Amino acid sequence: MKNIGIAINPSKDYKNTILNMVKEKIKNICNITDIEVYNSFDIKNLNLSSLDLLIVLGGDGTLLGVARELDDDFKAPILGINIGNLGVLSSIEISDLELALKKLMTKDCKVHKRMMLNCEVDINESIKNIKALNEVAVARGTLSRMVKFKIFVDEKLYAIFKGDGLIVSTPTGSTAYSFSAGGPFICPDLEVISIVPICDHTKSMHPIVLKGDSTIKIIAQNGGDQIYLTIDGQRAIEMKDNSVITVKKNPKSLKLLLFNDYDYFKVIRNKVLNNSKECDGEKN
């Protein structure tokens, strides 16, 4: 592994203190001095094809943003290092950096593929395709009435319901918004898609887990009130009444570098189910 790049969220490290420390440890442990540094907000359209590894310094939001904006030709794995708040998606905490780099040198790690979604939507009479790592959510505006949804799976009607919204999630996203809305945890290495309603008023829609190659078509009706499409909780697009949103598996997956002692269930316990200061030191 010769070419390492670092994508950093500058709002998490104003004075480059963490960045400089990371670069120094890479230099000393990996014997690599030529390290490219990128602003995580400016990743789109950059040619990163020469990289063997991209380190993402930030929190979950930083990693989500980078994953969506990476060019489809990008093939290197990502090592997420949490310097944010929660860090569910990150491979390690910043405090574990030195040990992680030593494991990297001994190849005590494995690349895991994380499924992504493709959302096709008509925006201003132009079809747009948008990637998502966590989820695609369709929901009413703040002061809007409930939305009527029609959901089709592979051209077959699954449900018609009224509610605040719905979430189409990847397994990676099952610990995020989907979980908050009552959806199940799904092991992130699986290739399935879940649909979870948000405040289903009619109780005619239940969460469902579908095979990964399913095509989901959503028709959202709100009598002219606001409807928003939100991607990974970061990009919001106002939709027209009777908008059609099509969601399916993206042909490209995210390659996430995880170490062999990575414990998904420990992450769930410590960072999702017991996300509090008292549990930060739990080691079991």
Curated annotation (Swiss-Prot):
The record's subcellular location field reads: Cytoplasm
Q: Which GO terms describe its biological process?
A: NAD metabolic process; NADP biosynthetic process
**What reaction gets catalysed by this protein?**
NAD(+) + ATP = ADP + NADP(+) + H(+)
Keywords in UniProt for this one? Answer: ATP-binding, Cytoplasm, Kinase, NAD, NADP, Nucleotide-binding, Transferase
Enzyme class comes to transferase
> What Enzyme Commission number(s) appear in the record?
2.7.1.23
Enzyme active site? 60 (proton acceptor)
Pfam family for this entry, one: NAD_kinase_C
Write one Gene Ontology MF term. ATP binding
Q: Which GO terms describe its cellular component?
A: cytoplasm
Highest taxon of the lineage: Bacteria
UniProt lists the family membership as follows:
Belongs to the NAD kinase family.
This chain's function reads: Involved in the regulation of the intracellular balance of NAD and NADP, and is a key enzyme in the biosynthesis of NADP. Catalyzes specifically the phosphorylation on 2'-hydroxyl of the adenosine moiety of NAD to yield NADP.
PANTHER family hit by this protein: NAD KINASE
Name used for this protein in its record:
NAD kinase
Name of the coding gene: nadK
